[in-house]
Amino acid sequence: TNPLLYKTSWIWRGVLSSTKRDSTFIVDGKRVDIPGERQHDAANIHSVDFPGLGTLEAIPNGNAAFFTDRMGFSDTIVNTGRYSLRWPGWAAFWRPLKALGFLDETPVPNLGDGTVSPMDFMDKYLAPRLVYQDDEKDLVAMLNIFEGVMDGKKTRLTATLFIERDLDTGLMAMSKGVACSAVIAAKMIARKQINETGVLSPMIHIPEVPFLESLKKRGIVVTENFETLEN
């Protein structure tokens, strides 16, 4: 354990950079920008209940409108957001550190050779302290919630994905999620299941059903639940 309740199975510098990422949401049909410096403000955080894990913090993370733009329904959608999920307390930890400049990328004068920034220090100092041990599992948790009208009824679709490290092979959950998806897409291209060329979009060009079935064969399952809401 550590005060962050977080260890990294990918690039720690990337985690630090994500704490400064600007976000664009659609709220009540209008685009709303959340600058990176306001990402961890209490007003921008909410809690979600993830099956099997309990309460997690949802923190603004990136341009949600990008996805609705690509799928062609930004003009009709009412609300959309994109969040990182973390254990409770993540935002409260980073909020004061960001305010004090610990994630600035400007070198600090008279510190070493004058080329070291606070971000550099946070990266080099913390990264080796946040490494998983051989008997520890990393977790990948994804939650997607969609609400709309289906067959004349207001409906909510909840899709969840949960991956954990395989201690027998040592393969990290993050590695499994990223690598398996890339391998499946590459095989689809080789087998002509995807005929388009050039830069492709997972949202548009990858056949959903065979892709999800291939993930399932590798132990990665997306669970979907539909429920009818009161009008």
Where in this protein do the model-derived segments appear?
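C-terminal catalytic/substrate-binding lobe primarily of soluble NAD(P)-dependent oxidoreductases
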Residues: 1-231
